[in-house]
Amino acid sequence: MTSGAPCLLIDAGNSRIKWALVQAGGSQIASGALTHGGEHQPDWLSLPTPGGAWLSNVAGESVARRIAALLEARWPQLPLTTISACAQQCGVTNSYTAPHMLGSDRWAGLIGAHAAFPGEHLLIATFGTATTLEALRADGCFVGGLIAPGWTLMMRSLGEHTAQLPTLDASAARGLLDGSTRDAARRGPFFATDTPRSLSAGCTLAQAGLVERMWRDLQDEWQVPVRLVVSGGAVDEVASALKVPHTRHDSLVLSGLALIAAGRAAERGA
């Protein structure tokens, strides 16, 4: 990566691709997102040439090929580094029995969270295609995590595997979770009076209940305050039902990628 040049960061998740172009000092020049499939293209035409691109990809080889083609079309021969989890990096220690098996998005998110909230014990909840929880001690030790079906996947699964329940997508479910429904669910107990609202509210509360349970359990086990950090595509819906304090951060993975890139550049003396 060229010294002093901006860096292109790419977070390829299961539902969409997020990207950001950042200065060497960390300030953001531009950012955007696109869905999977060829109909959407990133708005890179007006951007300066980066020194390199850094990719976290959990969406598979076809998405990796698409990203490589997009980069080659805009910036031929641009260096591309695809990250993977490791045992230790940027002040975070990975306690997975096989560290490389941890998803690169979760790894970058842990690094981003550790830097964003220094000296704090964290529970990181990410509401994407899957809902993931990560327990991160203040010293940077990632002790482990949980993976559950995401909010949208949970609703779709019920619709596809039952005879009479509707299949709700995120847009339809959001329309059912209006302000009064969310307020009632937060006050609790909440019981809906039609099937679509029963499904959307039930899946929302299932997500919130998992997070609240683990946040309380973690504080009981560690006997210290734990900050709950939330993010992801369904964060608005799930966070609206949470009854515990939480902090939203929408760019943990990209922030972690920036730190990984900066650390690698420092190692190389770039």
Swiss-Prot record:
Pathway involvement of the protein, from the record: Cofactor biosynthesis; coenzyme A biosynthesis; CoA from (R)-pantothenate: step 1/5
CC terms in the record's Gene Ontology section: cytoplasm
Reactions this protein catalyses: (R)-pantothenate + ATP = (R)-4'-phosphopantothenate + ADP + H(+)
GO biological process, one term: coenzyme A biosynthetic process
Paired cysteines (S-S): none
UniProt-listed Enzyme Commission number(s): 2.7.1.33
Cofactor: NH4(+); K(+)
Lineage: superkingdom: Bacteria
SUPFAM superfamilies assigned: Actin-like ATPase domain (SSF53067)
Cofactor binding remark: A monovalent cation. Ammonium or potassium.
InterPro entries with a match to the protein in the record: ATPase_NBD, Type_III_PanK
Pfam families registered for this protein in UniProt: Pan_kinase (PF03309)
Active-site residues per Swiss-Prot or TrEMBL entry: 105
Enzyme class at the top of the EC tree: transferase
UniProt keyword list: ATP-binding, Coenzyme A biosynthesis, Cytoplasm, Kinase, Nucleotide-binding, Potassium, Transferase
GO MF assignments: ATP binding; pantothenate kinase activity
Compartments it resides in: Cytoplasm
Purpose of the protein: Catalyzes the phosphorylation of pantothenate (Pan), the first step in CoA biosynthesis.
Subunit structure: Homodimer.
NCBIfam families in UniProt: baf, PRK13328.1-4
Family statement: Belongs to the type III pantothenate kinase family.
Protein's name in the database: Type III pantothenate kinase
Species whose genome carries this gene: Paraburkholderia xenovorans (strain LB400)
Gene name per UniProt: coaX
